[in-house]
Amino acid sequence: MYSVRFPDMPNVMTFGFSRSHALEMAKEALEGVLEVDLDHALEIPESKYKGGESVEVSPKIAFAIELRKARAARSQREVAEASGMTYQQYQRLENPKKTNPTLETLYRLQKVFNRKFLAI
């Protein structure tokens, strides 16, 4: 039995019957918590823990988190206007269940924030 916990997110714990199963369950647990936290506009903590195994989340969740951090104190409406899209279009980008940016959208956002997103 392998247990998994995230020191920066004490409310996230899981286990698996093998190492690979534990990592699979860790990804599922972490993604679930991050989706809920994003839905409720809660702050996502920066990982400060340097040990252990890294758990990669889906690109949609990673993008939503990166976009929200880049926006920082600006409102969604401000960023939407600056990038030439509607407020609702921008809102969907910060929702991991609905985000699916086109290359054109990524290009616009990179110009607004003066940075690249998700170098995959």
Where are these regions (language model features)?
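DNA-contacting interfaces and partner/effector-binding or oligomerization modules
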Residues: M1-A41
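DNA major-groove recognition helix of helix-turn-helix/homeodomain DNA-binding modules
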Residues: T102-I120
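Residues that mark the N-terminal boundary/hinge immediately upstream of a DNA-recognition element
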Residues: S18, S75-Q76, T102-T105
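A short, Lys/Arg-rich alpha-helix, primarily the initiator
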Residues: K48-A73
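Short alpha-helical DNA-recognition segment
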Residues: A73-R92
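DNA-binding alpha-helical recognition surfaces that contact promoter or target DNA
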Residues: E24, I65, K69, R92, ...
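Residue-level detection of the helix-turn-helix DNA-binding "recognition helix"
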Residues: N95-K97
